[in-house]
Amino acid sequence: MLTLHRAALVLPDPADPTAPSHPDGAVLVRGELVEAVGAYAGLAAAHPEARVRDWGDALLTPGLRNPYGHWLLERTYHPDPREGVGDEPVPDGLAGERDEARCGASARRGLQRMLGFGVTAVAGPFERAAVRTAVARSGLTVLPGAGAGAGVGAAGDGVGAGVAGPLDPLAVLPLAGALHGRVAVGGRADFAVFAPGAEGVEGHGGDPVGTGGSVGTGGPWVGGCRATVLAGRLVFRRR
């Protein structure tokens, strides 16, 4: 089945300054893979049978990487809403925990929350069997981490898999520094859709992905995550 994801601005490879951007663009997905990227009008005319998901004034980019996976999933406890203790992560809530089922359930809730921020890749290492299973079933790409005791991530960006960090990478990284991979023809269809920030996405000169913005802003034009797609599946959609 073909699905056409339309957005006001599609940035398939923001890390490459020579890569094209597509105002009123679209990504055509067949199964798990990207079949085409380009102008919406042309793709819609060429594939009238495709199902259209129109994300309106949004920005479509590759998904985000979360470099804090080890700490967030192996040490942090993500409460069950039925526990009545709120939904905020509990730092070191799993330290010394021996109940694998509890660890696995916490990891599943944490992963679901990551998807809500546009995360499509997460850094390990994951030492608990229950956590490894949860991550594998989530569909997120697993990245090598810096280790449980390290303080600098594999990307050399000053953050590491073994240190504390947020579920939302954009809380500490600009969008350009948080993106993982690119949206490329023949590649796995992993991407995220973001609402525009205060400046919108029209007239997209300057710095639409935050390469010149301050850490923690996520870039001047980026709002919250509207949707996350993993291997062609819509795994999160903000209501």
Where are these regions (language model features)?
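Divalent metal-binding segments
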Residues: 71-128, 164-170, 176-184, 195, ...
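N-terminal metal-binding scaffold of metallo-dependent hydrolase/deaminase domains
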Residues: 1-46, 169-220, 229-239
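Short, well-ordered secondary-structure micro-motifs within conserved domains or adaptor modules
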Residues: 2, 51-54, 154-171
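Active-site loop-helix segments enriched in His/Asp/Glu that coordinate
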Residues: 120-159
